[in-house]
Swiss-Prot record:
Residues 298-332 are annotated as: Disordered. The M ring may be actively involved in energy transduction. Keywords: Bacterial flagellum, Cell membrane, Membrane, Transmembrane, Transmembrane helix. It is a multi-pass membrane protein. Residues 320-332 have a biased composition (Polar residues). It comes from Buchnera aphidicola subsp. Schizaphis graminum (strain Sg). The lineage of its organism: Bacteria, Pseudomonadati, Pseudomonadota, Gammaproteobacteria, Enterobacterales. This is Flagellar M-ring protein.
């Protein structure tokens, strides 16, 4: 590379830089904007470097504690940051432990008092004071325990202990009210509320769950111990819908693998009994089975008449009157009766000659046990009284691709599958109805149209939201363009005008040289030369005028 080319490139760069500086120095607006931007960037960088690292001082501060701590921080001239969503108070990292020690000495922030209040034993405290301290300690400990739940921000508990009474009729149970401050956009589900109820009831003696009331910071009752009629009806309706949807899903799950997706539609109606019903039944039936008969009691009586004289043997002398409670006693007694009968017969045979006119009567009374059954039945709430299912099945396609109805045998199979899926019971009076019809084809396109409409509405909403931003950006770009490029356009016009004048002068010089060459050239034909000069003068009279001026200056 030659030194001349290097010098030319350096000179061109110098010219560009000089033009750039001249452009910015001539345009004062650009200088002001650049100066303001430079000041803002330097200030922001310096503040960012000087800003200390912040660390959490306290979490979940109440409004009263937060105001008290912030006032003390302002008096101590310590910077802080307060997060309203999380309730965190941030202070510089190097002053966290110092501030915690300072606030702990001043007993701030205020925390719930627990069993540590009982550590300070005081002389002369009355029994009422001890009871109040115990109640405060129990309330504080329960509040701390409930605050361990992730959803709960803080808790406040009030316990009402009744006065002790000597009479059982006047004895009352304690009651508890709880207010929970939950975190933002979070809530307690039914299982968590039940857990809190059982936790409190098991922590306090003789406290039942019915005597506990839990509300949140918005005054909403969380435990449904005293539901209204409307709420109970809503729960019943919700339970019925859940049961019906469960049976619908069973029908779809068993038929869609056979008939295809979206070829089966089912509706199930469930009649549910929400009444609480209890029944106690006692039955007595005679025991007709001879082998399994159980004797409850038995009585035997024998009358003997000799020589027209009636003699009634006492049960204690000859025929004992016995009540039997078991089969063992019965067998022993029957054996003794057989002996007595044999002795009577022997005596009759021996005395037959002496006592020709004799008579014997024997009465035997037996009481048997009856079959006795006692049953207690409690009907569950929410028992299904009756189910009715309606199923629509689409036509199937044959080998040629045409929609063909299903035959009767397949419909019977589908009906049997539906019955088995819902647990069909003839005793309850359940009913199942299956229809085979062709589905309406435009329903397939309707979801797409709805999707398109939703997409269009979303597009219009986004377009309307971002249109003001686009307009403002375009307006700002227009102002910047007008500010920056107006002066550059003027400079470009001036530069082009200068270049044009220089080109005109060069053209004039070249033409003058050509004329001088024509003038000093030796030609044989002067008429031709004069004719050419006349043509040049007609075309460019300025050149002739400049030549004449040059001649006059040369003469001088």
């Amino acid at each position: 590379m030659n030194f001349s080319t290097i010098e030319e490139s350096v000179s061109e760069e110098k010219k560009k830089f000089n033009n750039f500086l001249s452009y910015f120095f001539k345009n004062s607006r650009v200088l002001i904007i650049l100066f303001v931007l430079a000041v803002i960037t330097t200030v922001s960088i310096s503040m960012w470097r000087k800003s200390p690292d912040y660390q959490v001082l306290y979490n979940n501060l109440s409004n009263e504690d937060g105001e008290m701590i912030i006032d003390q921080l302002n008096q101590m001239q310590i910077p802080y940051k307060l997060s309203e969503d999380s309730g965190q108070l941030l202070v510089p990292k190097d002053k966290v432990y110092e501030l915690r020690l300072h606030f702990s000495e001043n007993n701030s922030p205020h925390r719930d008092i627990g069993y540590e209040i009982l550590d300070k034993e005081r002389f002369g405290v009355s029994q009422f004071g001890e009871q109040i301290n115990y109640q405060r300690a129990l309330e504080g400990e329960l509040a701390r325990t409930i605050e361990k739940i992730n959803v709960v921000k803080n808790a406040k508990i009030h316990i009402a202990f009744p006065k002790n009474s000597l009479f059982l009729e006047d004895k009352k149970k304690p009651s508890v009210s709880v207010i929970l401050n939950l975190k933002s956009n979070q809530g307690l589900d039914h299982s968590q509320v039940n857990a809190i109820l059982h936790l409190i009831s098991s922590s306090i003696c003789d406290l039942s769950i019915e005597n506990i009331t839990i509300i949140d910071q918005f005054g909403k009752l969380l435990n449904n111990s005293s539901l209204g009629l409307n709420q109970i009806d809503d729960l019943k309706l919700r339970y019925s819908e859940e049961v019906e949807s469960r049976y619908r899903n069973r029908i779809k799950n068993i038929l869609e693998p056979l008939l295809g997706f979206n070829n089966v539609y089912a509706q199930v109606t469930a009649q549910i009994n929400f009444n609480s019903h209890e029944k106690t039944q006692e039955k007595y039936t005679p025991n007709t089975n001879y082998k399994n008969q159980a004797i409850r009691s038995r009585q035997s009586t024998v009358n003997d008449k000799i020589n027209n004289r009636k003699e009634e043997n006492k049960p204690d002398e000859l025929f004992p009157q016995t009540s039997f409670s078991s089969n063992k006693d019965l067998n022993s007694t029957t054996y003794s009766n057989k002996k007595i009968k044999k002795s009577i017969i022997q005596n009759n045979q021996d005395n037959n000659i002496l006592h020709s006119n004799s008579a014997i009567s024997h009465d035997d009374t037996i009481n048997y046990e009856l079959n006795h059954s006692l049953s207690h039945t409690k009907m569950n709430i929410g028992e299904i009284k009756r189910l009715s299912a309606a199923v629509i099945v689409n036509f199937v396609k044959d080998k040629n691709g045409k929609s063909v109805p299903i035959n009767v045998e397949q419909i019977k199979k589908i009906k049997n599958l539906v019955r088995e899926a819902i647990g069909y019971s003839k005793v309850r009076g359940d009913s199942v109805y299956v229809v085979n019809e062709s589905f309406f084809q435009k329903n397939k396109n309707s979801p797409i149209k709805l999707l398109k409409d939703s997409n269009q509405s979303n597009f219009y909403s986004t377009f309307l939201t971002f249109t003001p931003w686009f307009i403002s950006l375009f307006f700002l770009f227009f102002l910047v363009k007008k500010c920056f490029f107006s002066s550059s356009k003027n400079n470009i016009n001036n530069q082009s005008y200068k270049n044009k004048t220089e080109e005109d002068l060069l053209e004039k010089d070249t033409k003058a040289e050509n004329i001088s060459e024509l003038k000093f050239s030796k030609t044989s034909n002067t008429d031709k030369l004069i004719h050419q000069i006349c043509n040049i003068s007609n075309q460019n009279p300025r050149i002739i005028a400049s030549i004449i001026r040059q001649w006059m200056s040369d003469k001088k």
